[in-house]
């Protein structure tokens, strides 16, 4: 079974579209875990209503909104995941109908996998939001729209996955076995700021563990719903500094993760 973890924060309309896209998946042996970095009542009601609307398992994990704690609730979802493999997506990315299937066919022990996403433009995003039923954008529709990185939306199922030595994951679209997540102790909860760090951190720790990284470009396709970019150079700088310190330490297993540890385990290169 696959555990699909969705990181969400307040965007209820986007989650509704994501759940519709999940309901269109060709591969059905999965569960959905919604990791909410907050406790929005409207979000809770949508998820509660979704239990009777969809024929897949939906679990909801949340905590009080006191700032950026996405990593903490993400670890809670990992802890409770029942699948042998875990896929991570963000709460503003709808999925191609064969998204989960392509991950399922590719994933294996000793490796982790990632994809990219189409950046939907404001007009096409509004069109999707305004429709009561999701119609997944076709490649032609993407070409004729105001979207960017459209080439990422071309589905090429016969394309071979490629090992990527110098290409890191994006936190919005990647997957790995739960066992490997436990071996590195999940996400490092020392990352308490947005913009930079937590996904790159777990990426290098999985490589340090000995895993190989593979691209599933043009196979595990996402469509990112438009919203204004929120970025802070100062916050990014602080996250980058912490990330560099962690890499200099060189430990695959973080202390402040799923478990709270006092002794680090170092793995040989």
Predicted regions and their residues:
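A conserved acidic beta->alpha catalytic loop
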Residues: 36-46, 93
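Glycine-rich, basic loop-to-helix element that forms the pyrophosphate-binding segment
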Residues: 64-81
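Short aromatic/hydrophobic "clamp" motif used to bind/position activated sugar donors
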Residues: 86
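Short, flexible, basic/aromatic active-site loop/helix in glycosyltransferases
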Residues: 133-166
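C-terminal catalytic/acceptor-binding lobe
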Residues: 190-269
């Amino acid at each position: 079974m696959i555990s699909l973890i969705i990181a969400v924060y307040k965007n209820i309309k986007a989650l509704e579209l994501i759940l519709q896209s999940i309901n269109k998946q060709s591969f059905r042996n999965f569960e959905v875990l919604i990791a909410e970095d907050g406790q929005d009542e409207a979000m809770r009601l949508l998820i509660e209503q979704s239990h009777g609307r969809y024929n897949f398992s939906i679990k909801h994990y949340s905590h009080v909104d006191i700032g950026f704690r996405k990593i903490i609730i993400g670890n809670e979802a990992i802890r409770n995941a029942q699948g042998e493999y875990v896929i991570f997506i963000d709460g503003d990315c709808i999925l191609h109908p064969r998204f989960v299937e392509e991950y399922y066919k590719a994933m294996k022990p000793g490796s982790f996998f990632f994809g990219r996403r189409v950046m939907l433009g404001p007009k096409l995003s509004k069109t999707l939001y305004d429709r009561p039923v999701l119609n997944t954008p076709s490649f032609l529709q993407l070409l004729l729209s105001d979207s960017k990185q459209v080439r990422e939306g071309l589905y090429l199922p016969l394309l071979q996955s490629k090992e990527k030595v110098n290409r890191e994951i994006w936190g919005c679209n990647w997957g790995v076995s739960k066992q490997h997540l436990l071996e590195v102790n999940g996400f490092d909860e020392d990352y308490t700021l947005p913009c930079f760090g937590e996904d790159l951190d777990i990426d290098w720790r999985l490589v340090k563990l000995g895993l190989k990284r593979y691209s599933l470009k043009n196979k595990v396709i996402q469509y990112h719903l438009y919203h204004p970019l929120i970025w802070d150079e100062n916050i990014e700088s602080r996250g980058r500094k912490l990330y560099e310190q962690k890499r200099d330490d060189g430990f695959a297993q973080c202390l402040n993760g799923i478990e709270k540890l006092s002794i680090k385990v170092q793995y040989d290169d």
